Amino acid sequence: MFYIAIILAGGTGALLRHLLGRATVNLGWAALPFGTLIANLVGCFLIGYLSWMLVYKWHMSKEIQIVVLTGFLGGFTTFSAFSLEVISMAEEGSPIKAIAYVGIQVTLSLMMCFAGLLLARQL
């Protein structure tokens, strides 16, 4: 049952990431892959926040922690899509855009993870 929960959580996270990506394209935000950026930023915040809350505030089991952090957030965030997007930008003649996207993604992702941890520690 534990493995099924991880699979379902991962699938749910992946589906939400896909829908987010489609929504950003439908909004006309095609200059950068904003769906991946938003998913990674939200996911980084949530992993910072939930990794603290699940253990220290809510006292959840290790299994629940794995389902939420590895399953759901692992499916929701994506480093592989980010990597492919960067390479595609560079190969399509936009190396500066690719480098800027790396800087934005990494810097903001670290900041969001830290913000999530800080918020959780204050509660």
Map each language-model feature to its residues.
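Membrane-interface helix-loop junctions in multi-pass transporters/channels
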Residues: 1-123
